[in-house]
């Protein structure tokens, strides 16, 4: 699962009203593609994808977004009896988002941080029970 982005075919014509429950452009970070993977703010607040298929990036600094995400994962886990989550693209969301999200889920969490730098990946070990990274 990825909690940070929503696929779109074209940023210029994106109709946010169709993206339920995040149906306002203010629910997302302003459009910018990630250009510097050494800049954590750029990684967390710019969009994944490319000019042909940009992935709108949720504003996970917004308390309303955080609350909605936490309620959503709690309900999803309960409804489907999920016993563990693999969270892809974890480095694209601020680290302090994840503890409350994992607590709301109430199940085993495995975070994916695709990077070959142990120093960069190490802080995520305190966030998730298991880490996947490229070494």
Regions found by a protein language model. Give the residues of each.
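Core domains of carbohydrate- and sulfate-ester-processing enzymes
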Residues: 2-51
């Amino acid at each position: 699962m990825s909690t940070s982005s929503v696929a779109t075919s074209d940023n210029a014509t994106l109709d946010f009203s169709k993206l339920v429950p995040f149906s306002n452009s203010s629910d997302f970070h302003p459009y910018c593609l990630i250009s510097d993977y050494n800049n954590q703010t750029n990684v967390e607040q710019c969009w994944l994808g490319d000019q042909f298929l940009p992935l709108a990036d949720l504003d996970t600094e917004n308390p309303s977004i955080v609350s909605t995400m936490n309620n959503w994962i709690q309900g999803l886990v309960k409804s489907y009896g999920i016993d563990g989550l693999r969270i892809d693209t974890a480095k694209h969301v601020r680290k302090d988002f994840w503890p409350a999200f994992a607590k709301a889920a109430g199940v085993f969490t495995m975070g994916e941080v695709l990077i070959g730098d142990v120093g960069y990946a190490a802080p995520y070990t305190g966030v998730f029970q298991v880490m996947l990274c490229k070494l």
